[in-house]
Regions:
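Short, well-structured N-terminal submotif of metal-dependent ribonuclease cores
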Residues: 1-35
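Residues at secondary-structure transition points
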Residues: 18, 34, 55, 80-87, ...
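Acidic, PIN/NYN-like endoribonuclease modules and their adjacent C-terminal/linker elements
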Residues: 80, 96, 106-133
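PIN-domain endoribonuclease scaffold, especially VapC-family toxins
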Residues: 26-76
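Short active-site oxyanion
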Residues: 30-33, 97-99, 117
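Active-site neighborhoods of divalent-metal-dependent phosphate/nucleic-acid chemistry enzymes
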Residues: 67-101, 106
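A secondary-structure boundary/capping signal
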Residues: 6-7, 35-36, 104-105, 121-122
C-alpha cells in the first residue's frame, strides 16, 4: 500500500509520543511512504514556528525522509480544497500513485476519496492496516 501522510499527522508523530507516532511507525514497517519536498518544507516550517528544531527532531525527520519515496507533484488543474496547502497533499498523492492519504484535517477527510485515493483519519488507517496486515 502506498501512503501519503499529511503534515498534521507527521507533526503529531514527531512532537508527541502517542497514537500518531504508532500509526507512522506501523506504516513505515508495512507500506511504501510517498512524500514531496513541498510537504517536507511545510513540516519543517511548522516545527520551526512551534518549537525550535532540536538535534533529536532533526535526526527523526531525516530518518523519516530516508524511508520515503520523494515525488514532484504537479499543481492540480483546479483548486479542490479551501486551503491551498491541502491541494499539495492531494497532488503529492497523485504524483506518487498513492492508495491512501492519512490526515487529521477535516477539509480533506470530508472528501473521503480523491481520484480513487482514499482519505482516512489515522485511526481509520490503522484499522485498515490491522485488517489487511
Amino acid at each position: 500500500m502506498r501512503v501519503v501522510f499529511d503534515t498534521n499527522v507527521l507533526y503529531s508523530a514527531l512532537a508527541a509520543k502517542g497514537f500518531c507516532e504508532e500509526v507512522v511507525d506501523e506504516a513505515v514497517a508495512e507500506c511504501d511512504i510517498v512524500w514531496s519536498n513541498a510537504l517536507k518544507q511545510e513540516l519543517e516550517s511548522l516545527i520551526t514556528r512551534r518549537h525550535k528544531i532540536g538535534p533529536a527532531t532533526r535526526v527523526a525527520l531525516e530518518a523519516y525522509a530516508d524511508l520515503c519515496e520523494f515525488v514532484e507533484p504537479e499543481p492540480l488543474d483546479k483548486r479542490v480544497c479551501r486551503d491551498k496547502d491541502d491541494d499539495v497533499v492531494l497532488a503529492t498523492a497523485l504524483a506518487g500513485n498513492a492508495d491512501v492519504i492519512v490526515t487529521g484535517d477535516e477539509d480533506l477527510l470530508v472528501l473521503k476519496k480523491f481520484r480513487g485515493i482514499e482519505i482516512l483519519s489515522p485511526r481509520q488507517f490503522l484499522e485498515r492496516l490491522d485488517r489487511t496486515g
